[in-house]
From Swiss-Prot:
GO terms for biological process: translation. Residues 26-44 have a biased composition (Basic residues). Keywords: Ribonucleoprotein, Ribosomal protein. Pfam families: Ribosomal_L35p. It comes from Methylococcus capsulatus (strain ATCC 33009 / NCIMB 11132 / Bath). The keyword Ribonucleoprotein applies. NCBIfam families: rpmI_bact (TIGR00001). This is Large ribosomal subunit protein bL35.
Amino acid sequence: MPKIKTNRGAAKRFKRTGSGGFKCVQSHRRHILTKKSTKRKRQLRSPDMVHPSDVRAVARMLPYT
């Protein structure tokens, strides 16, 4: 049986945690930052967890993590 291909886009965006979830970088921090408050930009720095309902789909895209 052939190997399953890893979705390369997903591999660059998600990392598996020790407890089996996935963490990802939050969006809205690339450009047009002048109108966003310092507090909002600081909070966007912290990693975000993938929602439990999406974990199965992400795990399917990353079979070897």
